[in-house]
A protein has these predicted regions:
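Non-catalytic accessory regions flanking glycosidase/transglycosidase catalytic cores in CAZymes
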Residues: 1-224, 229-238, 262-263, 267-300, ...
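Active-site His/acidic residue clusters
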Residues: 242-257
Length: 499
């Protein structure tokens, strides 16, 4: 049996963890909204048309913030279309996903849904095809108390109190040629700066997220972030990162090593932010918003054919990845990587939340169930609050097709305000269990509380509506601090010690 060791000291920390690290994302795309979170004709719909079964699952994830309404969708979106009486809202073509948007679920509905889901709104504005005044007006509509045309219109539309939305995305993936109104870095940086400036003039308490490059494969990656920040540094608070991984070639070892790339991606963008900080002689630190991250590849070929040949419609089956057990391991490894970079990654949005590359799936007029990736996200959101500890990992290493010196075991650790310690660990070895020796220093008396394990002998095992519990955590005995414990082969582990 392989051996590994994890050394932790309560005085060696990375950073307090921003609670928004465990956010998610709802876009007007596919069935995320219509027949996802919103289905008025469903037998479990509430008085506003929100599916209660979906709300129950979302609450279990305990997501603190949900990004909305896009995504690529937002670059052609007119926010005013989504307010007022539903029967008067216009139907529009959504060029991003070649669908028809009825706007029967809009801004007020999402704010109400977020309250019922015990989450907050992270609202994205359109900087592709709209202008700076629109940015001002939507903040005024949402956050200004009363006494202006836009704030009084919100009141007329049924919301006396301001929505008080604190987090705002300045567009989406504006370097991408697929984006409606794509920009050069200079064009976008200037526009983002002016938009953020007037938005903060309306409400000085808000924070803004500038678009980073759409990915490391973009030809302007790095130079994009630098130029955008040179133009907008003083008025933005975060830079966005988007990252998806897949296993199209069925190389599980290489797939599970993908977080080596994620760690480098995070550190590269953080270094660019700090370089601009130095150039500008600024005392302000711009941090990171990893506001799209997940596994995404299962549905891509199907979606390509559907997108090319389908008629215009609403609530089409787009990006409906069915996740398997190895995908859950990778999601767990991504969460571990985010926790170990908690000093710079302050916001995270698992993309997305329902039906569209999502931990939660629904059937129209049918059931709702948790996909495999639901469980690592739920575990991290439940137990990963507090302070990220600096781990010393001693484990064997291996090479894969694209990565070298990949640790056989990866881990992150969190200490909450009560002094309880939670360890998240993944055994990357596909066939052999691993003994983990825990050396917990200066924590005082701790007693074993839980060892939860997500494991399946079949890496391709899936959860479905008819069999929703194929991949589900089990509880194993948790040894005392200092005693070794066993990580099953290919497993996600949550190990807790409490005061």
């Amino acid at each position: 049996m392989k051996q590994s060791k994890l050394i932790l000291d309560k005085d060696y920390i990375i950073s307090p963890i921003d609670r928004r690290l465990y956010g998610s994302f709802i876009e007007h795309l596919g069935r995320a909204v219509y027949t996802g979170i919103y289905e008025p004709a469903h037998p479990l719909a509430d008085e506003q048309g929100f599916r209660r079964d979906v709300l129950d699952l979302v609450r279990k994830l305990n997501v603190p913030v949900v990004r909305y309404p896009g995504g690529n969708f937002v670059s052609g979106f007119r926010w005013e279309d989504s307010i007022g009486p539903k029967e008067q809202r216009p139907r529009r073509l959504d060029l991003a996903w070649k669908t028809t948007e009825p706007n029967t679920f809009g801004l007020h509905e999402f704010v109400d849904w977020a309250k019922k889901a015990n989450t907050e709104v992270m609202y994205a504005i359109n900087l592709g095809t709209r202008d700076i005044l629109d940015a001002q007006y939507v903040v005024e509509y949402c956050n200004h108390p009363s006494g202006t045309a836009w704030s009084d219109l919100r009141i007329k539309n049924g919301a006396k109190d301001p929505f008080d939305i604190k987090l705002w995305c300045l567009g989406n993936e504006m370097d991408g040629p697929w984006q409606t109104g794509a920009k050069t870095a200079y064009e976008y940086g200037r526009k983002a700066n002016e938009a953020a400036k007037v938005m903060k003039w309306v409400d000085p308490t808000i924070e803004t997220v500038a678009c980073g490059s759409s990915g490391t494969g973009m030809p302007t990656f790095g130079t994009w972030e630098h130029e955008v920040l040179m133009q907008a540094y003083d008025n933005v608070d975060y830079v966005s990162l988007h990252r998806y991984y897949g296993n199209p070639h069925n190389d599980t070892q290489d797939f599970l090593a993908s977080t080596m790339d994620l760690d480098e991606f995070i550190k590269t963008v953080a270094a660019i932010c700090d370089g601009v900080k130095g150039t500008k002689h600024s005392k302000k630190t711009v941090n990171l918003s990893l506001d799209e991250w997940n596994v995404w590849y299962h549905s891509k070929n199907q979606d390509h054919d559907l997108y090319k040949n389908k008629p215009w419609g609403t609530a089409l089956h787009l990006l409906e990845d069915v996740y398997n057990f190895e995908d859950a391991l990778l999601v767990g490894l991504m969460l571990i990587t985010m926790l170990r970079n908690a000093d710079r990654v302050k916001i995270g949005c698992l993309a997305q939340l329902v039906n569209v590359i999502a931990p939660i799936m629904t059937r129209e007029n049918g059931g709702a169930w948790a996909q495999t990736i639901f469980y690592p996200m739920m575990d991290a959101s439940m137990y990963g609050r507090g302070t990220s500890l600096l781990p010393k990992i001693v484990a064997g290493k291996h090479d894969t097709k694209h990565y070298t010196d990949v640790p056989d075991m990866d881990a992150a650790a969190v200490m909450d305000d009560a002094g309880n310690v939670t360890i998240f660990a993944v055994n990357r070895d596909l066939t052999e269990p691993m003994v983990l020796d825990l050396d917990l220093r200066s924590f005082g008396d701790l007693r074993p509380a839980m060892h939860s394990v997500l494991h399946h002998d079949d890496m391709k095992a899936e959860n479905t509506e008819s069999a929703p519990d194929v991949v589900k955590p089990v509880i194993l005995p948790c040894p005392k601090p200092g005693d070794p414990l066993v990580l099953p082969a290919a497993s996600w582990n949550v190990i807790r010690f409490v005061k």
